[in-house]
């Protein structure tokens, strides 16, 4: 046996080299991390399986096959505009994370892009949100509804933009969360939402002795009493001035009717005519005499 030359089968050597890849899920995660989360797990598994689960060969195959044909969109992370950013949050508390992003490329984003969870702690059941296609250099805010973990501590997760075909692009967005029992992030966001809702509601013009703590019926009765109180001096003066008759004006009109009803000249030849005048007799039951 000593000094024997043995030719090893290349296929057998390849199988031995694959024995070091113990877990396919670990290889997929490592492949995805090395590519900067530019490919989804299914795509990573495709290239790994094509190269017999050799990580180095799979990465080379990916760049050889994809690079000449890929037009990758561009995205730059601008800032974290979350309300209460930097504050800790209590356990099991809903909150909203908001980031400002920009299309930093020269072409518009393709339709169907989304912001997707790619690693770390997920913070709730939402793992992706749709994002509208941004024009070159356009800026937009993207919000994600999240929930803090049930235990206190420091947590982190990663999110990234993704095309409809599963191609990741742009900066990795990090979520770093401090969970404490006395955290104020949830309260801060609730107060901010109340203030926004109050400012958007139409304001009512308050007049008179309006009581904001009284029931609507009492306020309505108070307004009606101010307008229709029969015992008030203003109502008496208004009613008297409106409905009181004007006797002098009526008598003047009646006298004018009496004077202008018959006008006889002294030289009139009809001396046997009886002249009837009506002065102040318009209020009787028979203004023209009884028949």
UniProtKB/Swiss-Prot annotation:
<dbReference type="GO" id="GO:0050687">
    <property type="term" value="P:negative regulation of defense response to virus"/>
</dbReference>
<keyword id="KW-0597">Phosphoprotein</keyword>
<dbReference type="InterPro" id="IPR032350">
    <property type="entry name" value="N_BRCA1_central"/>
</dbReference>
<dbReference type="Pfam" id="PF16158">
    <property type="entry name" value="N_BRCA1_IG"/>
</dbReference>
<feature type="modified residue" description="Phosphoserine">
    <location>
        <position position="215"/>
    </location>
</feature>
<protein>
    <recommendedName>
        <fullName>Protein ILRUN</fullName>
    </recommendedName>
</protein>
<comment type="function">
    <text>Negative regulator of innate antiviral response. Blocks IRF3-dependent cytokine production such as IFNA, IFNB and TNF. Interacts with IRF3 and inhibits IRF3 recruitment to type I IFN promoter sequences while also reducing nuclear levels of the coactivators EP300 and CREBBP.</text>
</comment>
<feature type="compositionally biased region" description="Polar residues">
    <location>
        <begin position="212"/>
        <end position="228"/>
    </location>
</feature>
<keyword id="KW-0391">Immunity</keyword>
<dbReference type="InterPro" id="IPR039517">
    <property type="entry name" value="C6orf106_UBA-like"/>
</dbReference>
<dbReference type="Pfam" id="PF14555">
    <property type="entry name" value="UBA_4"/>
</dbReference>
<dbReference type="GO" id="GO:0032720">
    <property type="term" value="P:negative regulation of tumor necrosis factor production"/>
</dbReference>
<dbReference type="GO" id="GO:0016607">
    <property type="term" value="C:nuclear speck"/>
</dbReference>
<dbReference type="GO" id="GO:0032480">
    <property type="term" value="P:negative regulation of type I interferon production"/>
</dbReference>
<keyword id="KW-0539">Nucleus</keyword>
<dbReference type="GO" id="GO:0005813">
    <property type="term" value="C:centrosome"/>
</dbReference>
<dbReference type="InterPro" id="IPR009060">
    <property type="entry name" value="UBA-like_sf"/>
</dbReference>
<dbReference type="GO" id="GO:0005829">
    <property type="term" value="C:cytosol"/>
</dbReference>
<dbReference type="GO" id="GO:0043392">
    <property type="term" value="P:negative regulation of DNA binding"/>
</dbReference>
<dbReference type="GO" id="GO:0045087">
    <property type="term" value="P:innate immune response"/>
</dbReference>
<dbReference type="GO" id="GO:0005737">
    <property type="term" value="C:cytoplasm"/>
</dbReference>
<feature type="region of interest" description="Disordered">
    <location>
        <begin position="199"/>
        <end position="291"/>
    </location>
</feature>
<feature type="modified residue" description="Phosphoserine">
    <location>
        <position position="265"/>
    </location>
</feature>
<comment type="subunit">
    <text>Interacts with IRF3; the interaction inhibits IRF3 binding to its DNA consensus sequence.</text>
</comment>
<keyword id="KW-0399">Innate immunity</keyword>
<dbReference type="InterPro" id="IPR013783">
    <property type="entry name" value="Ig-like_fold"/>
</dbReference>
<dbReference type="GO" id="GO:1900181">
    <property type="term" value="P:negative regulation of protein localization to nucleus"/>
</dbReference>
<feature type="modified residue" description="Phosphoserine">
    <location>
        <position position="222"/>
    </location>
</feature>
<dbReference type="GO" id="GO:0005634">
    <property type="term" value="C:nucleus"/>
</dbReference>
<keyword id="KW-0963">Cytoplasm</keyword>
<feature type="compositionally biased region" description="Low complexity">
    <location>
        <begin position="257"/>
        <end position="276"/>
    </location>
</feature>
């Amino acid at each position: 046996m000593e000094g024997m030359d043995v030719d090893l089968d290349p296929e057998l050597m390849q199988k031995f080299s694959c024995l070091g890849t113990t877990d396919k899920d670990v290889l997929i995660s490592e492949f995805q991390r090395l590519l900067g989360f530019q490919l989804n797990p299914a795509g990573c598994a495709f290239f790994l399986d094509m190269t017999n689960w050799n990580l180095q060969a799979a990465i080379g195959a990916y760049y050889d096959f994809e690079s000449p044909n890929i037009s990758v969109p561009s995205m730059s992370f601008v800032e974290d505009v979350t309300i209460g950013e930097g504050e800790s949050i209590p356990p099991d508390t809903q909150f909203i994370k908001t980031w400002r992003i920009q299309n930093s490329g020269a072409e518009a984003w393709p339709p169907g892009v989304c912001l997707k969870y790619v690693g770390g702690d997920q913070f709730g059941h939402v793992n992706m949100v749709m994002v509208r296609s941004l024009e070159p250099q356009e800026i937009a805010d993207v919000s994600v509804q999240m929930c803090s973990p049930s235990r206190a501590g420091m947590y982190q997760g990663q999110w990234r933009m993704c095309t409809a075909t599963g191609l990741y692009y742009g900066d990795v967005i990090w979520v770093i969360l401090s969970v404490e029992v006395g955290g104020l992030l949830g309260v801060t966001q609730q107060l901010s939402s109340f203030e926004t809702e109050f400012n958007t509601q139409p304001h009512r013009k308050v007049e008179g002795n309006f009581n904001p703590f009284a029931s609507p019926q009492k306020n309505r009765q108070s307004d009606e009493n101010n307008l229709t109180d029969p015992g008030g001096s203003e109502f008496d003066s208004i009613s008297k001035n409106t409905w009181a008759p004007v006797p002098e004006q009526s008598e003047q009109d009646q006298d004018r009717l009496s004077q202008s009803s018959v006008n006889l000249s002294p030289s009139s030849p009809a001396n046997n005519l009886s002249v009837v005048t009506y002065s102040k007799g318009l209020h009787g039951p028979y203004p023209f005499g009884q028949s």
